């Protein structure tokens, strides 16, 4: 639904990344359709795909590998604005500074290269770049899995804040159910390329029904040994 965060969970190889990359138009599925704004992304020509990508942006798992190491932060964030020819260089520079402030990066760092930032800061650059075109949908492909726990919390809180401010719809992919529980309104569980369960985040954790979902929940680490010993085994 518009304005919600839909979590997509499943083990490695379940098809999560393939699905999200298909929605982004980065890979073409062998069959089926993906509709956005009454247009089939799978069968869209380059012109339509270019227009669709303006409204659907993506944050990748690796905050370093997804950034061009030859560009400074300001150029990286401005790249979508340049590619779509939406504003002059002066206006783009101003917009970049606004985006850096939005993702809680010091605009004074605008001329730093990716290697001069921490992992969490690099992911904030990726988020700023994804927001440059003011998309309607933000695809998040394991955006915090490469970060340590404290930085994960900071980035998740940032995404929640941005979602509220911009009325964004998010598809948040993760293998970590604790992370998804924190950020998602609803959760879809994927196994072998199929959605096997779809419920509100609260219901998934309190009233899961599918055996695969129960198995994922059972795999969440619990620090209390007395509780750990009572886990269900499959």
Model-identified regions with their sequence ranges:
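Helix-to-loop junction immediately C-terminal to a conserved catalytic motif
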Residues: 24
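Conserved ABC ATPase signature
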Residues: 113-117, 121
